[in-house]
Structure formats: C-alpha cells, structure tokens
A protein has these predicted regions:
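Positively charged, polar, low-complexity stretches
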Residues: 2-89
Length: 89
C-alpha cells in the first residue's frame, strides 16, 4: 500500500533561516562553526533576500577554503569578498 506523502512546496522564509543557522553551526571544522555560527545567529534575521542567497552560497563552499579566506591566507572569490571581510572582523 502506498503511503501518501505531504506535498512539499517552496521553502518558507522561517525554514530557510533555521536551515542556514543549522548549517552555520554544523560545519566540518570547529573553527568554521565558531566563525559562521555566531554570525548567523546575529545577522540572518536582518538580511534581505540577496544577502541570504549569497550567505547560502557561501555555506556550500569547502570549510578549508572558507577558513583560508577568513584568515587571510588566500583571497576569496570576488562575489564573496565583502561577506568574508565582514566575517573576518
């Protein structure tokens, strides 16, 4: 017997914020947990859609690359430069 599954529609704004907050705190390295987690806790709620899209894209990046960008060991891609500078403060 097939069990009916609820239809899933577009992600709600609230769910998106929760998902992004979780991804910020549950990274592959503790260093990035401690950098991205507090940032997400304090900033996500005030971001517009474009800023959320950019931060969401940043969360898809490799932790080792992110750490090198935030610590100044490597230059970030241009699209992330301002966000990385804000994270590094």
């Amino acid at each position: 017997m097939d069990i009916p599954r609820p239809e899933t529609g577009p992600e709600t704004h609230e769910h998106r914020l929760k998902r992004m907050r979780m991804r910020s705190w549950r990274r592959g390295t503790k260093e990035m947990d401690l950098i991205l987690g507090p940032y997400a806790d304090t900033r996500l709620g005030g971001m517009d859609a474009a800023a959320l899209d950019l931060f969401d894209a940043l969360l898809d990046e490799n932790d080792q690359d992110l750490y090198r960008w935030v610590s100044g060991q490597a230059a970030p891609p241009d699209r992330f430069a301002a966000l990385i500078a804000e994270l590094a403060r």
